[in-house]
Amino acid sequence: VASGYGPPSSHPSSRVVNGEDAVPYSWPWQVSLQYEKNGSFHHTCGGSLIAPDWVVTAGHCISSSLTYQVALGDYNLAVKEGPEQVIPINSGDLFVHPLWNRLCVACGNDIALIKLSRSAQLGDAVQLASLPPAGDILPNETPCYITGWGRLYTNGPLPDKLQRALLPVVDYEHCSKWNWWGSTVKKTMVCAGGDIRSGCNGDSGGPLNCPTDDGGWQVHGVTSFVSSFGCNTQRKPTVFTRVSAFIDWIEETIASH
């Protein structure tokens, strides 16, 4: 899986709930997963482009009864800006992790792969995400960014422009404490954020982007769930599927299709 580098200008300032508009095209592996309803397509989840014809998203984003397309190189979903690529998805090309159970989000395995019906054209606005090595665990407080078109606050509106928010990693030792997520969080997950900024509905499936030593970014998480008490509840960080726990499954799935 190729490595993803945003342009240097994409490193966000230190200042998605209580996030801010992203710099346009600064997260060029971010995709919008859209489903068809009454003849038009609607944003439902995020995702990350990990090969020219493969996207990783969350298992809970996929319903076998729906028709999907993926929009790449998008910034403002409401406006045609030029670099967008919209690629249809064939129904047989949705690969949800075999152990995903939508009745048990806390059981983990909330990850899916989507094969595009044609390869994306890579360029400034569309690039491949870099994935971490298998088993890689981020230290506490690693300054990662969630990106997505999720609700701006609990039950709030969906934004048109891609949002980003700084979510420091909360390590498993802290996140699994009884008054945090307790046993709901598993070692195959990553927690990030706290109470002020968080993921929200619509960010699901999108990336947790974490800095690398050489100035690039790696997608360490696939946005999975937030607290039912609200998107920015204290001691309930946003929870992500830990990508480094699923590298083997990702590579095997791509190789066999």
From Swiss-Prot:
Gene3D superfamilies: Trypsin-like serine proteases. Keywords: Disulfide bond, Glycoprotein, Hydrolase, Protease, Serine protease, Signal, Zymogen. It comes from the Eukaryota. Residues 16-255 form the Peptidase S1 domain. Glycans are attached at N38. Residues 3-15 form a propeptide. Disulfide bonds join C45-C61, C104-C107, C144-C210, C175-C191, C200-C231. Its EC number is 3.4.21.70. The keyword Kinase does not apply. It catalyses: Preferential cleavage: Ala-|-Xaa. Does not hydrolyze elastin. One of its GO terms (biological process) is proteolysis. GO terms for molecular function: serine-type endopeptidase activity. Residues 1-2 form the signal peptide. The keyword Glycoprotein applies. Efficient protease with alanine specificity but only little elastolytic activity. Belongs to the peptidase S1 family. Elastase subfamily. PANTHER family: CHYMOTRYPSIN-LIKE ELASTASE FAMILY MEMBER (PTHR24257), CHYMOTRYPSIN-LIKE ELASTASE FAMILY MEMBER 3B (PTHR24257:SF22). This is Chymotrypsin-like elastase family member 3B. The gene is CELA3B.
